[in-house]
């Protein structure tokens, strides 16, 4: 039986190297593994990019997303018959029409709001935006508390930012409704509330495991993550069934003062308003 290709999609405040431990283990098992760069420029564009990348792969695919990457794969996989299973690791799993900021507001518990560092930027077309980083001094405690401080410091230095407006975008699809899904919940996650992760997994009828880990589970617990991917690749876990279309709980999109970046609930309209103003072209 041909083994599927495993595609690993990272989230915010990380890069593809966060999958190194997982990729190494899967390759030893004989899997073909690719970890494309997630642009982190907005949910619609990021999902379209990954969807296009998937078309370059022949044969079955196991598509894996960490954190914000979960929202990306849930849209990118829609309509692609090669994607046989989805794996969500400490991830967002929005329903169609659901924005990540509103979803996060329904399940408070993130401790990362105070760790954000907004950095304005200008696009080539003259429009402006705001990138979100995690402050280096707060990265360890907020994102990767179960890793050595020195390792977390390197991760903080090499993190990739996400555009703030990405977390006001509404998901265009929810592929977990039609594709069997697996999910990993980190019980010590300070980025995305474990309660939110459990809710999403239950809503998606996902085969779920819980790990005593921080938000950086792919780095701190690569064997547990790899084992879950193996289950998804082999179909081991018969209770993993796609959710029926329309069967998911219809959540209200709140009136949008909350913004979530990789699980960060940023309350108040100040930064959102600033981000919107910066997107307007100069006159």
What positions do the PLM features span?
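Active-site catalytic motif of lipid deacylating hydrolases and related acyltransferases
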Residues: 2-59
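Gly/Ala-rich beta-loop-alpha elbow adjacent to hydrolase catalytic centers
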Residues: 64-69, 73
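Conserved serine/cysteine hydrolase catalytic core
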Residues: 157-204, 208-219
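Post-His helix in hydrolase/transferase enzymes
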Residues: 219-234
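Extracellular Ser/Thr-rich, low-complexity/disordered mucin-like segments
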Residues: 238-260
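C-terminal membrane-anchoring or membrane-association module
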Residues: 262-283
